[in-house]
């Protein structure tokens, strides 16, 4: 959050009237405070939804920035007065309640994975002892077959669909 807040301050010092918007996807609840920006946006199906929210997103920030965005994200003229609930308020609120604990568990698991894979000789980012600003952990296998075998091994030990064997395919939107 400190680096993002510093960028926000630099932008505001350079250009008055500019809105700084941060897509905080996977970054929510990973630090003591959220980054400073005019507006933070994110998905409820990731960190803040705690695995419970089936859909949705959020906008938060300065009153003016949120007001301007609200007229683009809802029906014309309704702004922040309404929002899509789709009959899912219960799951969304349960997700918000559970999210800090679930994100903490994800961070611990990422630290552990980084430590284990570092000890096994793999290149990881972030390193096990580095500060994290999200719940993403990268492990570089160095070759496609290693990644494929890893995914298949995880799936074979999973509680759900362990009989399924994941196979690579040309997924739209990804070149590699």
Tell what function each PLM region has.
Residues 1-104, 108, 117, 121-125:
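Conserved PLP-enzyme active-site core in the AAT-like
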